[in-house]
Amino acid sequence: MKNIFLTSESVTEGHPDKVCDQISDAILDAIIKEDKDARVACETCSTTGLVMVMGEITTTSYVDIRSIVRKTLAEIGYDNADYGIDARTCAIITSLEEQSKDIAQGVDESEEYKDNKSDEYDRYGAGDQGMVFGYATNETESGLPLPLELSHKLARRLATVRKEKILNYLRPDGKTQVTVEYENDAPKRIEAIVVSTQHDPDVDYEQLKEDIKREVILKIVDESMIDENTKFFINPTGKFVIGGPMGDAGLTGRKIIVDTYGGFCNHGGGAFSGKDPTKTDRSAAYFARYIAKNVVAAGLCDKCEVGFSYAIGVAKPISMFINTFGTNKIEEEKIIQAINENFDARPKAIIDKLDLQRPIYREVASYGHFGRNDLDLSWEKCDKAEALKKYL
């Protein structure tokens, strides 16, 4: 097999789109903590000195939206207007309504449950139509593709050296990107690393490049993967002072590839942040990852993509497919059988299995929803692997 070059990117928690994701999920967490059955579809947008929160929320709880916005901005590090927005002084606009009753009637009681109320897992219908995908690979311990894993780690390291004042001239906004050369379908070397980070205006460019390479890149990347041909692009425009919501308007749901698998598999188009778990865009995508990770952990294949489609108001998935990219150790039909016999992809079953009605979403709103070994996430567990091994 010829060598190929594959690339993934990530962004820091201070990227304007990620700021919006974190605000939306912080609001969701606050609501679901008080009212686990709340229906939340919370969107956020941001620009210079302004945050707007909008969407549809049905809940018995009360949360102070403005306080959550300011707290989230402050935790990220936006405490100075020069950075693009100041948590203490920014304007906040809210425009929130209840969930449409037309949608609610299909979610509260699915098509199947209306006909036969004997199965509790038929109760919830999917909150919308659409497709979701999950993916896992054995090329890293996290089950993520190496370019994405490294991009996330570099982005987190940027935030760490900023917050710990190792590089005290850094500002919150930043992006990372890694290109890996694959040989015979396995990572061989790193072709290129891109790091762009917001900074104070009086920083010497050459000093910044030296600092970022020493304190960020070489602290994360295995030097055995770097050779004399590896390219480093550090703030390649030469200047990144204007950033955050001042540099680019931010919007919830615009980093869906960063949130998932870095372009290594399909994506149904639905974002995660700000959505309660009755939305299959989120819950079923987490479940598809859970399945794929267990299938790979069981040794049924080296790579696995799992896809589901849903109809609004219907509990059972309309379709399910898998792709093992030619790495399957048994027939794919047998893997499908194993999935069907061990996993229930109806929304209520997913919510119960993964315990999704809890305030866990703010933590995954930056640096990826998957492969998070720093968190105890239910959809990252491989507790079905032993049961799946019997199909080998």
Swiss-Prot record:
Gene that encodes it: metK
Organism classification: Bacteria, Bacillati, Bacillota, Tissierellia, Tissierellales
GO biological-process terms attached to the record: one-carbon metabolic process; S-adenosylmethionine biosynthetic process
Domain of life assignment: Bacteria
GO CC annotation terms, alphabetical: cytoplasm
The protein, known as: S-adenosylmethionine synthase
EC top class named in words: transferase
Subunit-level organization: Homotetramer; dimer of dimers.
Species: Finegoldia magna (strain ATCC 29328 / DSM 20472 / WAL 2508) (Peptostreptococcus magnus)
Subcellular location, record wording: Cytoplasm
Catalyzed chemical reaction(s): L-methionine + ATP + H2O = S-adenosyl-L-methionine + phosphate + diphosphate
